[in-house]
Regions:
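A short, solvent-exposed beta-edge/loop patch
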Residues: 155-210, 214-217
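Glycine-centered tight beta-turn/hairpin loop motif at sheet-sheet or coil-to-beta transitions
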Residues: 43-45, 67
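A cross-kingdom marker for long, charged
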Residues: 214-226
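Short N-terminal segments immediately surrounding and downstream of signal-peptide cleavage
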Residues: 21-37
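Bacterial Sec-dependent N-terminal signal peptides
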Residues: 1-23, 218
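Aromatic-patch recognition
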Residues: 52-181
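A short beta-strand micro-motif
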Residues: 37-43
Length: 226
């Protein structure tokens, strides 16, 4: 319970810090307004410290080293702590842990909505190329982790010289290292979940799908069936 409360409070702190700073932009497609000191834990058990951030294109983990921004292969990463926030590798992407259950956890994902920027209706400037210093969206289509420059100081200096980057947010349940959207339909599709019994569980526990505390109860319920 203490661990759950800690994660919940940490999530609120992270949200507050982000809300008080500028939002991500086309030039600065990151979850945080700057790279933050953190610690990475590898799947094999090794650890390393550095300045990390999460790229909103693919949930990629980026690191500043010797003034240059690089991408870390998450295939070797188990989890990373950035400030007070914890991220876990699920299927090759980094997801923010919102709460942990007995044998699973609830995660959040924030993704850049690049399609909203390049719509033909003129929204968000209608074109990515102007903000990206000559890099056109077509040239980089599919490579959502690209940056205008990998030089940290240069990128930091121009991060507000482009339009705000729209984002979408999703919440998932992680059970047996598998990702399930946090909705009833997705949970009912999990092997071993009985529709009638699960519906009774939801009703008796007054489960609200938008409450992280309730989602942890669902995770614990599902893992208890294993």
């Amino acid at each position: 319970m203490k661990k759950l409360l800690f994660l919940f409070v940490s999530a609120l702190v992270g949200m507050t810090v982000f809300a008080q700073d500028e939002m991500p932009t086309v030039n600065w497609p990151y979850l945080y307004p700057d790279f933050i000191q953190g610690e990475l834990m590898q799947i094999g058990g090794g650890t390393s410290k550095g300045q990390y951030n999460i790229h909103l294109g693919q949930g990629a983990l980026h690191l500043v080293e010797n003034g240059q921004i690089g991408e870390i292969s998450v295939q070797t990463v188990m989890k990373v702590t950035i400030g007070e926030d914890i991220f876990r590798n699920v299927g090759g992407r980094m997801y923010k842990v919102l709460a942990e259950g007995k044998d699973g956890y609830v995660v959040g994902e924030t993704l850049a909505d690049y399609s909203a920027i390049v719509r033909d209706d003129g929204a968000y400037g209608g074109s990515l190329s102007n903000a990206a210093k000559g890099f056109s969206y077509d040239e980089n289509y599919g490579n959502y982790s690209y940056l205008v420059t990998n030089d940290y100081a240069d990128l930091l200096s121009i991060k507000n010289e482009s339009e705000e980057l729209p984002v979408t947010k999703n919440t998932y349940l992680v059970i047996d290292n598998q990702l399930y959207p946090a909705n009833k339909k997705s949970v009912l599709a999990i092997e071993g979940v009985d529709k009638k019994v699960f519906s009774e569980f939801l009703k008796s526990n007054d489960i609200k799908w938008k409450e992280v505390v309730d989602l942890v109860k669902i995770v614990d319920y599902i893992t208890s069936l294993k």
